[in-house]
Each structure stands twice: as structure tokens, then as C-alpha cells.
Regions:
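Conserved glycine-rich Rossmann-like NAD(P)H-binding loop of the short-chain dehydrogenase/reductase
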Residues: 71-85
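Canonical Rossmann dinucleotide-binding motif of NAD(H)/NADP(H)-dependent dehydrogenases/reductases
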Residues: 48-74
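Short, flexible catalytic-loop segment of classical short-chain dehydrogenase/reductase
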Residues: 245-255
């Protein structure tokens, strides 16, 4: 049984296509960026510290609110309308925000986002909360977006992250349900060059059985990748960690709870130690710790926060019979 993924809302088109076109007018006070071009702004951007938020859902939003005061937020999403809506909320709360479109499964698109971010100032924080879930996509698409896409984000932003910068990648409790991999498989997921990652034998269609399996191995791969990238990021004086949330009440989670695996998800909640699902704000609190000065000794780590569901899966009422 998988945990509810943390990416929110289905993409408006299949990842891998070109960057989205610029849409209608943006909210007042918000700059829109696409293909690294600023097309609308209310004034010169003077902020020098930039927080990049990839994925306009409520989890990325919750972390951003806690770490972005006095900084410039670059909010990127596959869907421009999602980015605009989230940016308006942040702007209304007093944050300075730009928006951009990004397809994390495209190196060209991720690189363009990096160029946009560095043109705004020093990238001091990255929040990667984009992805697709087992109910949204095929195994191949999940691997391309959730596994390869995360590797691209870590690689590209690892080249420019500022000293004392930090990154949080949203993984999932699902990665903790996958049986143990071999040391060789762990190393392959952690260190294979991004553009060779999807050619690994363990990721071929005859090995990845279904969308749930693809999601679990992608999320396990995220935490392994972050551990390896922490070495490289550390040489720049920066940190990177993953958070593996369980069932967090987001729009996507509510879709999952009413979907074909909904009964299983509800049982997870019922038998967990916490006896409830989580909130984006709770994930935001952990994200703020990891990205802030109090988390300065934490890097290359994965934080499982699922109310005890994984504990119940391995050692409690959810344990496989």
C-alpha cells in the first residue's frame, strides 16, 4: 500500500512537451516569467536572495511562506494558471513573487528555470514539490517526472546554489514501503548521471510492474539521490534534504481518498499512531527547519512524517500477512 503522493493536481498536458505558453494577465504585483523572459512586472526587482518553488501546490506554498520573507519567490509550475493562482495568494500576503512555467522532465526547461532564477539574484533556496502520482500517470511517465525530473532539478540547481543555501525535495512515505534494494541498486539510483538514469536495467518495463511500483522506486530514488547530492552541494557550502510525508490533506490527497485505493488510504489513517492525516502546514514546519539556520547541521537526510503509518505497515496492523 502506498502513501498519498505529495504532488498536487494533474498536469495540464503530458510532461516532456515544450514549455507552456504565457496565459492571460497575472495578478497585480506579480511578475510572470516564461522561457526565461519577464513579460509583465510592476517594477524593478531588487531582491537579491531568491527562493525557487517548483510545484504550485499547497505543500510547496506552506514551506515558501515560512522561509521567503524578505526574499524574492520564483514560483514555477507546469500549469501557468496554477502558478498564477498560488502567486496571487503569496503576493497578497506581502511576498514579492515571479512566476514561470517548467517541465521538470525536460533538461532544457529546468535549465531555463535556473537561468531565470539566477537572473533575479542569488538562489539561496529551492523547494521541489512537483510530480505525478500513481493515479495520474503511467509507470514510464512517473519515472520520467518523479525520478529523472528530480535528478535534473538537483543537478541543475546544484550548479548555482548560493553558499549557505538549502533545498528541500518532497518525496513520500511510499519510498519507505519498497523492500530493501541491493547496495548496487542503491548506488545506481543515487549516482548514475541523470541522463542515463532511465536506462538502468532495474527501471525497464519488465522490472517496474505498475504505476504504484514506479512511484515507490522513484521516491526511494529521490532520498538516495539527495544523499549523494549532499556531498556535491556541501562543496558549495549548501545543504539538501528530503521530506517523506504520508497522507497530507491536499487536493490531490482528497482525489486519492475518493479513488480506487481510497479504502486502503482511509485504513492507513485509522490504524496509524496519530489517527489522522497531516496538513500542509505541518510539512511546512519541517521544511522551515531544514531550510533555516536551526537545520544547519542537517544535510543528506530524509525526514519521514506520516503519523506512524509506515511503522504500522512494518510492525503493526498494516503489516503484510
Amino acid at each position: 500500500m502506498s502513501g498519498v503522493p505529495c504532488a498536487e493536481g494533474p498536469p495540464s498536458r503530458v510532461p516532456g512537451s515544450n514549455l507552456a505558453e504565457v496565459g492571460p494577465a497575472v495578478p497585480l504585483g506579480v511578475a510572470r516569467l516564461a522561457n526565461s523572459e519577464m513579460t509583465t512586472t510592476t517594477g524593478e526587482i531588487t531582491m537579491t536572495n531568491v527562493i525557487v518553488v517548483i510545484g504550485a501546490g499547497s505543500i510547496g506554498h506552506a514551506i515558501a511562506r515560512r522561509v521567503s520573507a524578505g526574499k524574492h519567490v520564483l514560483l514555477a509550475d507546469l500549469n501557468q494558471q496554477n502558478a498564477d493562482a498560488a502567486a496571487k495568494v503569496l503576493n497578497d500576503a506581502g511576498f514579492e513573487v515571479s512566476t514561470a512555467t517548467v517541465d521538470v522532465s525536460s533538461r532544457e526547461s529546468v535549465h531555463a528555470l535556473v537561468q531565470t532564477a539566477t537572473a533575479l539574484g542569488d538562489v539561496t533556496g529551492v523547494i521541489h514539490a512537483a510530480g505525478v502520482s500513481p493515479t495520474q500517470a503511467s509507470p514510464a511517465t512517473i519515472l520520467k517526472v518523479d525520478l529523472y525530473g528530480t535528478a535534473l532539478v538537483l543537478e541543475e540547481f546544484g550548479n548555482v546554489i548560493a553558499r549557505s543555501g538549502s533545498c528541500v525535495v518532497i518525496a513520500s512515505q511510499s519510498g519507505h514501503r519498497l523492500p530493501a534494494l541491493t547496495a548496487e541498486q542503491n548506488a545506481a539510483l543515487a549516482t548514475t548521471p541523470a541522463d542515463e538514469l532511465l536506462t538502468l536495467p532495474m527501471l525497464q518495463p519488465d522490472q517496474v510492474r505498475d504505476s504504484l511500483h514506479a512511484y515507490q522506486i522513484s521516491k526511494r530514488g529521490n532520498s538516495l539521490r539527495v544523499m549523494a547530492e549532499a556531498v556535491r552541494w556541501g562543496k558549495r557550502g549548501a545543504r539538501v534534504n528530503t521530506i517523506s510525508p504520508g497522507i497530507i490533506f491536499t487536493p490531490l490527497a482528497r482525489d486519492e481518498l475518493s479513488g480506487p485505493r481510497g479504502e486502503g488510504y482511509r485504513r492507513m489513517i485509522d490504524v496509524s499512531a496519530a489517527g489522522r492525516g497531516g496538513t500542509p502546514d505541518e510539512v511546512g514546519t519541517v521544511g522551515a527547519l531544514l531550510m533555516g539556520p536551526d537545520g544547519g547541521f542537517i544535510t543528506g537526510s530524509d525526514f519521514l512524517m506520516d503519523g506512524g503509518v509506515t511503522a504500522a505497515y512494518w510492525y503493526g496492523e498494516l503489516a503484510p500477512k
